[in-house]
UniProtKB/Swiss-Prot annotation:
Residues covered by region (RNA binding): 179-185
GO biological process: microtubule-dependent intracellular transport of viral material towards nucleus; symbiont entry into host cell; viral penetration into host nucleus
Entry protein name: Capsid protein
Protein species of origin: Hepatitis B virus genotype A2 subtype adw2 (isolate Germany/991/1990) (HBV-A)
Maturation and modification: Phosphorylated by host SRPK1, SRPK2, and maybe protein kinase C or GAPDH. Phosphorylation is critical for pregenomic RNA packaging. Protein kinase C phosphorylation is stimulated by HBx protein and may play a role in transport of the viral genome to the nucleus at the late step during the viral replication cycle.
Keywords: Capsid protein, Cytoplasmic inwards viral transport, DNA-binding, Host cytoplasm, Host-virus interaction, Microtubular inwards viral transport, Phosphoprotein, Repeat, RNA-binding, T=4 icosahedral capsid protein, Viral penetration into host nucleus, Virion, Virus entry into host cell
Role: Self assembles to form an icosahedral capsid. Most capsids appear to be large particles with an icosahedral symmetry of T=4 and consist of 240 copies of capsid protein, though a fraction forms smaller T=3 particles consisting of 180 capsid proteins. Entering capsids are transported along microtubules to the nucleus. Phosphorylation of the capsid is thought to induce exposure of nuclear localization signal in the C-terminal portion of the capsid protein that allows binding to the nuclear pore complex via the importin (karyopherin-) alpha and beta.
Positions of short motif Bipartite nuclear localization signal: 160-177
Cellular compartments per GO CC: host cell; host cell cytoplasm; T=4 icosahedral viral capsid
GO molecular function per UniProt: DNA binding; RNA binding; structural molecule activity
Region annotated Disordered, chain positions: 136-185
InterPro entries xref list: Hepatitis_core, Viral_capsid_core_dom_sf_HBV
Length: 185
């Protein structure tokens, strides 16, 4: 069975695969971040959102995987086999959990549009030959400040991604990030 844990949220495994494995913080850092930002919602018996549920499940899966790894480490007597299991868990399962945790936390923190736009921007940047791309990769936290997306209204053009050169950009900070943090659920 080929299950894509990102599909219902508008992303895909392929879209996240453009981010290199060293891009994702450690599981411990991601767990600390999730706890600091969303502890109340994660521990609540109430259903908050599909992302909170998915984040809970990823955290629980990591805990179970660590329990299994500890059991294997304590009960597998052959050191070579033990090392193979530990390396497999850290390399493959660890990366998948880090990707899941990063995606869920980013989605809750920055919102769907910003995260998806970041994934597409990074994918385009990384596939562009170095001689033709800017030296620095896109940064997720700066996307809301550097892009302009307008809602579709009657009589307006569908989307404008960058301000026209004639218009000065407002110096007031954008509030998209703080709005997503206000409602924990």
């Amino acid at each position: 069975m080929d299950i894509d844990p990102y599909k219902e949220f508008g992303a895909t495994v392929e879209l996240l695969s453009f981010l290199p494995s060293d891009f994702f913080p450690s599981v411990r850092d991601l767990l600390d971040t999730a706890s600091a930002l969303y502890r109340e919602a994660l521990e609540s018996p109430e259903h908050c959102s599909p992302h909170h549920t998915a984040l809970r499940q990823a955290i629980l899966c990591w805990g179970e995987l660590m329990t299994l790894a500890t059991w294997v480490g304590n009960n597998l007597e052959d050191p070579a086999s033990r090392d193979l299991v530990v390396n497999y868990v850290n390399t493959n399962m660890g990366l998948k959990i880090r990707q899941l945790l990063w995606f869920r936390i980013s989605y809750l923190t920055f919102g769907r549009e910003t995260v998806l736009e970041y994934l597409v921007s990074f994918g385009v940047w990384i596939r562009t030959p170095p001689a033709y791309r800017p030296p620095n990769a896109p940064i997720l936290s700066t996307l809301p400040e550097t892009t302009v997306v307008r809602r579709r209204d009657r009589g307006r053009s569908p989307r404008r991604r960058t301000p026209s050169p004639r218009r000065r950009r407002s110096q007031s900070p954008r509030r998209r990030r703080s709005q997503s943090r206000e409602s924990q659920c």
